[in-house]
Amino acid sequence: MRPPPRLEYSLTGVRKSLGGKGPLRSPPNSMMKLKDLFKDSLRNLGLYMPPAPLWVRPLSARSCFCRAVVQNGLLNRRQMVHAALRYRLGRSKNDAVIYWQIDQMGRVHDGKLMWYGADCHRLKDRHATWVTYLMKQYFKLPQGSFQSNHVFFGLHLVREPCTVCIVEAEKSAVILSELYPQYVWLAAGGLFELQPQKFWALQHYQIILLPDTDEELRAYTQWYAVAQQVMQSFLWPKQNRIYVSDFLERHASADQKRRKIDLVDYIQEST
């Protein structure tokens, strides 16, 4: 059996049958890749190939935050990579970490971009921003055109019966998840980001709140009030109490309270 003709000979025949002269040559850098050919074949068959989820595209453990965590000895590299994959951390083009807010159904609600210095603390001169805000700017949409419904950072990890610990900063949730893996660690994203409506996805779980500390007990008082408001709702299961930990209030020094440290800071300074 004779071998099939080479592709260029076949194209030459097609060229001649169309009245052209000489061999048919592809323009430079236009050779179709195998994966593109596969996509075209599926498209011709009427099959739909959904794009990768938004959080998958910039998934990275090399952002300024991840590097600072390893360099300061808060986690080793293996732990950092594991935590980055679990929390689906991203990285922007200008080296910010992206904290994706993903619910238990896998839906992305928003992404928070933050910058950290070499000491693993936030850069005060660079304010956090949101992916939805940047998208509105890019597509020239009015800022009031739509509002994202924020959820707890790390909510996608709450699936099986577990004890859920909620801290203020996303950074703390990521680090503590490797130090105390027996709990599922979520983050509110700020002192006043602990809002009652965010708790409805957690009404069947045991919840422990761990606010930051300060001299005036403002964080503890604020979070305690929110916990009481949630538990007093007639829709909240009465057997599921929300505990507000006063660990930092009892153990932090006066100087630490003045600096408004969180649990990660306390652990780092105690070792």
Predicted regions and their residues:
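Generic low-complexity segments that are intrinsically disordered, proline-rich and/or Lys/Arg-biased
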Residues: 4-6, 24, 28-29, 51-54, ...
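Generic cytosolic/nucleocytoplasmic N-terminal low-complexity/intrinsically disordered segments
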Residues: 7, 15, 20, 28, ...
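Helix N-terminus capping/helix-initiation residues
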Residues: 50, 153-154, 262
